[in-house]
Structure formats: C-alpha cells, structure tokens
C-alpha cells in the first residue's frame, strides 16, 4: 500500500494535501474494523475495483485462509491490515527496502544512494501532522522512522542500517552491469 503525491502539488496545496491524507487515514481505520470487513469486501469485489468473488476477498480480510492442501486457518493474525500495526505509516526503512529491491533487479544502479533520495521525498512529517489533526492516539503513531530489522518468510534478513548485506545474501538477483546472478 502506498500513497504518493508530487512535491510541487504538496507545496502548492498544503491544505488539500492534509485533507487527502486524513481522508485516506479515516478510510484505513474504517477498513481495519472487523465489523466493516464484509461491506468493504463487497465494494472491492465489484468489477470496477478487484472484480473477484466476494467470498475470496472477505475470507482474506477476515484472516480465513484455505491453503488448498487441507490446511485451513481461521482468524489468522496475518490478515489484511489497513491501519493496525502502523500499516499506513511511511517508514523510511520500507522505502529503503523497496529501493534495495530495485537495485536487486537492476532497475537502479548498485551505487544508488537510497538514503539521500529518501531524505528528499519521504514526508512522514505530513503523515504525522494529519494524524495529529485527526486526534490519532500516540500509541498508534510510530516512535521511529524505521521498523528495524525485518526477517522474511525465506529467512532472509533486511537491516536498514546495512542494505548491502541483504543484497549480498540473495542468490536470485540481477544487478545492473553484473549480468544475471
């Protein structure tokens, strides 16, 4: 999930920017509420959005999964998140991981300075201001710009303090100028 706006728009329209952010945040909070999941799934199932069977969408929103192997999980903690667990917060560590993945696949050069780019474009200050205007409790606002070290399902670890170590640990990648690895 990402929400991006051009810097020239943000600078020229600060009130509209905050209004847009607050509207998105309120929608995320609404979607997060279990009582609203069925309604949200019905909306998303429509042709103009996901165009998928309602049952397929609502089960995932509730955290009900049928893995097709006889393994069925209900009310999984791994259900779709919209607001809880800082799902909408623009963590700089997430930005760095996405940029690192773009380096991994050769879309950005290996020497790309992701941290400098993030410092220019990540506007978590706007998110925090919108959250404050909405009266979001402090417990729902991250204390850090980083989620810290992330461990993925395959056991790989991404430490935002050392993205090169993550890249070096990957066996499947294409790094520009180095051919397929």
Regions found by a protein language model. Name each.
Residues 13-121:
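Secondary-structure end/capping motifs
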